[in-house]
């Protein structure tokens, strides 16, 4: 069973709010001020640490194996829109990601970064603090730089398919 835990911070009890149909892998960790929308999934060894600030996950998102989402006390939060795919071993620290975006395996997003709707961050990319990635842009490298623009229909379709696949994978565990 996944570790889902409330915490006490600043005199408040903060309990994860998780939609009833969310898949949580047995060793996923969800702590503190975390909200996860319907149809989403949090996979093996993923950690969502809402202990120091808020993490909001939209609908039909997938947080894949080994990813870590954490924030900065009194400074940065995390918001993922709907149909966001977070690849294996991604680190998101205080960054926001809009609907239909894809964060490739092993990428890192630092505080204050923003990934626009339908954007793609390539595997292994390092998105530096405060970087603003526009809608449907593809970025990659260390540090991440703009590569090209993608068609909105392409990125939306890619992430709908990934979300559908991860919903299917989650159904195998019920």
List each language-model region with its residue ranges.
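N-terminal segments that cap or nucleate solenoid repeat domains
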Residues: 2-42
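Glycine-rich hexapeptide-repeat left-handed beta-helix
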Residues: 1-17, 51, 57-59, 65-68, ...
